[in-house]
Amino acid sequence: MRPFQFSKPRFLISLVILVACGFAATAFAEEPKEWLGKNLDDLVSLYRQFHASPELSFREEKTAARLAEELKKLGVEVTTGVGRQGVVGILKNGAGPTLLIRTDLDALPVTEKTQLPYASKVSAKDKDGNDVGVMHACGHDIHITCLIGTARYLASHKDDWRGTVMFIGQPAEEIGAGALAMLDDGLFKKFPKPDFGLALHVDSSMQSGKVGYRAGYILANVDSVDITMRGKGGHGAYPHTTIDPIVQAAQLVVNLQTIVSRENSPFEPAVVTVGSIRGGTKHNIIADSCHLKLTVRSYSDKVRKLLLEAIKRKANAVAAGAGAPEPMIEFSDATPATRNDESLVS
């Protein structure tokens, strides 16, 4: 997984500034692109600092503190600790609508191997106690920089717009828990409920300088599935005396691929990916269990339901065919699809 590069970051930050100002703007005294050209070096430096100092989900203490510090410098009213590490900044500028601009804060348990001068050298314990590298491999460092750049422009060009801007630093996006934590902590009870919401996500598959957007679905439902295939362990030289969970897991991996290709309509986007298989400890020992971790992506509720029910059915069928106990199946990290408001996008 390669990091996102700041080859042409001006397009990302300009996009946010233009849309943020556009909801209540007059003529610009200074065009956002002109301002960005003057301030780009400082923003790139800021990005590299965030990139070199990543933090895992719900551990974003330094990241949240730095975001809060940058916003306070601009005269933004800042509240920290919303939903644990969440940051809320309010910039008021007269009567007008309220716009929410949001960034995610957390990084991934990925070891960086880019050899860049600002590469992450951070390591940590994951939730299972394993030693892992930590990296902004999903571009949240860029997202934070875009938000700060937008805040700097808006704070220094108040004659160009009217209204209230709410800047949100959301923790734990990667585990699908941070937004809910902020809502449960009274986000829209303690602070204004916005008329509009704006966010972006970098995409390394797009040509540098291009921006992609559309009305309707833009990001998929995300479901995580943990499956434990159970069996009867024993010696590898006597497999006939065992019920091999690793063979079950192998069969299940293949069977799962027929859900998308044979049970789902080709006109409905869907993905079922097995990201991890773990079972056994030695060459000559058949384990008692084998664990699989899946990610499931879809847009509609109908397809989402089809995929999850089919996964459960196929796992149970494999176990039954092997004469094994029923597998343990856990669904978690459910995050609904993002659907862009057609009136705002068109």
Predicted regions located by residue number:
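Extracytoplasmic/secreted envelope proteins and their assembly/folding machinery
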Residues: 40-47, 64, 68, 151, ...
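Bacterial N-terminal signal peptides
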Residues: 12-24
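Metal-dependent amide/peptide-bond hydrolase catalytic core
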Residues: 73, 250-346
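Acidic/His- and Gly-rich active-site-bordering loop/insert found
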Residues: 30-136, 145-162
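Histidine/acidic-residue-rich, glycine-tolerant segments that coordinate divalent metal ions
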Residues: 119, 123-135, 141-142, 154, ...
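N-terminal secretory signal peptides that target proteins for export/translocation
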Residues: 1-9
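Structural recognition of the beta-strand scaffold that forms the well-ordered cores
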Residues: 79, 98-102, 166-169, 197-199, ...
